[in-house]
């Protein structure tokens, strides 16, 4: 099964949106196999967002993601990358559909609440950047039989 890294960014934490966002993820049937509250330091932020280095918004992105605590989680499931991305909505909240996390809770692109892996390859890379193998739990739920064939 695919794995996706999700980061509830400092604005999501400060606005008290951890519970509502985690509820949506769990209600969709995705398995949370790793979860932690942490403060991302500048070195980790630069590694995570290395693809954006040199872009005009890079410095403000690093300042934002390191400005307060975040909740980082790993979710698994069939087609998890695509599912999570559709739940999250467009990067620009102004273009995010109602019913998505950003469409319902975010207002501007610079404070868009949540990061989600954009490909299976990046999902694996990001999971390994933020979690050690022993921090992840291979959890099976009793409800899985009602979610997966």
From Swiss-Prot:
Cofactor: Mg(2+)
One Gene Ontology molecular-function label: nucleoside diphosphate kinase activity
One biological process term in Gene Ontology: GTP biosynthetic process
Main enzyme class: transferase
Major location category of this protein: cytoplasm
Active-site residue numbers: 115
Keyword Transferase carried by entry: yes
Compartment annotation: Cytoplasm
Signal listed as a keyword: no
EC number from the UniProt entry: 2.7.4.6
SUPFAM superfamilies according to UniProt: Nucleoside diphosphate kinase, NDK
GO cellular component annotations of the record: cytoplasm
Alphabetized CDD domains for the sequence: NDPk_I (cd04413)
Family indicated by similarity: Belongs to the NDK family.
Name this polypeptide is given: Nucleoside diphosphate kinase
Organism: Roseiflexus castenholzii (strain DSM 13941 / HLO8)
Lineage: Bacteria, Bacillati, Chloroflexota, Chloroflexia, Chloroflexales
Gene label: ndk
